[in-house]
Curated annotation (Swiss-Prot):
This is Large ribosomal subunit protein uL15. The gene is rplO. It comes from Xanthomonas oryzae pv. oryzae (strain MAFF 311018). NCBIfam families: rplO_bact (TIGR01071). Binds to the 23S rRNA. Residues 1-12 have a biased composition (Basic and acidic residues). Residues 34-47 have a biased composition (Basic residues). It comes from the Bacteria. It holds the Pfam family Ribosomal_L27A.
Length: 147
């Protein structure tokens, strides 16, 4: 048998008629039309529940306590570890020099030196905050800190 365009038809069962609901009890889907009795799912627009809604029970996001917050100061301040300063040339160190050396990300608005490791070079910090331990280490290496 040759295949012709006018003989083409979908496979058996590939295209079924849509089920008509609510058209008498003889159909098996009359009266409640497969939606059950009452409740939100039986209604028009039913089943569309807001995220977090738990049926009137106090929702999880209200049952649990609020905890913590993200400090804007911490977000805008970059930490620079003291041993990373050795990547720079000895001398004056300010925020611009730290950014040029890629020690401070572009989103940061200020920097703070934190003590970790040893310092071998003499630095003069200008306009950069430092912890008490970092100040002591810089001064012990012969440098100074100017706020």
């Amino acid at each position: 048998m040759t295949l012709r365009l006018n003989d083409l038809k979908p496979a058996d069962g590939a295209r079924t008629q849509r089920t008509r609901v609510g058209r008498g009890i003889g159909s098996g889907l009359g009266k409640t039309a497969g939606r059950g009795h009452k409740g939100s799912f039986a209604r028009k627009g039913g089943g569309k529940i807001k995220a977090g809604f738990e049926g009137g029970q106090t929702p999880m996001q209200r049952r649990l306590p609020k905890i913590g917050f993200r400090s804007k100061m911490a977000r805008d301040t970059a930490e620079v570890l003291s041993y990373q300063l050795d990547k720079l040339d000895a001398g004056d160190v300010d925020f611009v020099a730290l950014r040029a050396a890629n020690l401070v990300p572009s989103r940061a608005k200020k920097a703070k030196i934190v003590l970790k490791g040893e310092l071998s070079k003499k630095f003069v910090l200008k306009g950069v905050a430092a912890t008490a331990g970092a100040k002591a280490a810089i001064e012990a290496a012969g440098g100074s800190v100017e706020e």
